[in-house]
Amino acid sequence: MMQDLRLILIIVGAIAIIALLLHGLWTSRKERSSLFRDRPVKRHKHDRQNSFVDDSDDEAFDNQQKPYAHKQVKSHQEYKAEPAIERRQQKLTEIDAATPEESDDPLLTGRQPETTARRAAIEEQEPQLGLFEFEEQNESERNGSAIEEKSQEAAGEKEAQTKVKEIVLVLHVAAHHGQELNGESLLQSILQSGFQFGEMQIFHRHVNPSGSGPVLFSLANMVKPGSFNPETMVDFTTPGVSIFMMVPSYGESSQNFKLMLQAAQRIASDVGGVVLDDERKMLTPQKIELYKARIRSTLGVQV
């Protein structure tokens, strides 16, 4: 009985000793693994503290040597990357790349300049897509303006040439020196010469003596304003009348001038007056030829 009890105690003691040994080994390994796992963190903390100390020393030195550059040093230190922060930024690179907006986290400020620069480059390229269109549009507008200006200049030159081509030939029927023409006899002679009273209150010679068709030449009073009143011409007197025509005119200008000359000579004969040229001098054959030459010259320019 005593031997059995002793054997049991020996076995229980051996088991207890083995359990204690195993527990000691397990505890030792656990502490060792925990020690190795904590060492990098402590080392990183120590390095970061040293970095902060170095930065503080550098800042103090720079403040002593360059007091006016304090803001530049501080700005440079804010963007200075720490070892632990750089590793954290590397882990968050994928997250930042997937995020469309810029992060406000101070730890990610190192990445913001790159993102901002990329966006700025894209934004600068986008407006340039329409730059050439705008330049082409401006070029088209300038070309259109130049063409329009040239067209206006050509039209102006053409109009000026047209105005230069048109001339006025004038003949005067005047009374002798110190006399005046009688209105009643003058009116009868004017009507017999084929004139009709019309626009501007003067007489006009139309293609048809009845008063229809285009006007070939006209007759006005030499006294301003040059108009007539047929109802009061019985008691009317005037120093003379003026007959004028435009060149070119309807039909043949040379033939129209002959008709005007014949009408002036007939009226002068009826009222006892004389025919004068545009300078109010006696009309001579040489002056008549000069009128015809002016007509030919004007028509030649037109052609």
UniProtKB/Swiss-Prot annotation:
Localisation: Cell inner membrane
Disulfide bonds: none
Topology relative to the membrane: Single-pass type I membrane protein
Cytoplasmic side: 28-303
Keyword set includes DNA repair: no
Chief location: membrane
Annotated spans, Disordered: 39-61, 66-85, 124-159
A cellular component annotation (GO) from this entry: cell division site
GO biological process: division septum assembly; FtsZ-dependent cytokinesis
Skewed-composition ranges (Basic and acidic residues): 75-85, 139-159
Assembly: Interacts with FtsZ via their C-terminal domains.
PANTHER family: CELL DIVISION PROTEIN ZIPA (PTHR38685:SF1)
Protein family (similarity comment): Belongs to the ZipA family.
Protein name: Cell division protein ZipA
Name of encoding gene: zipA
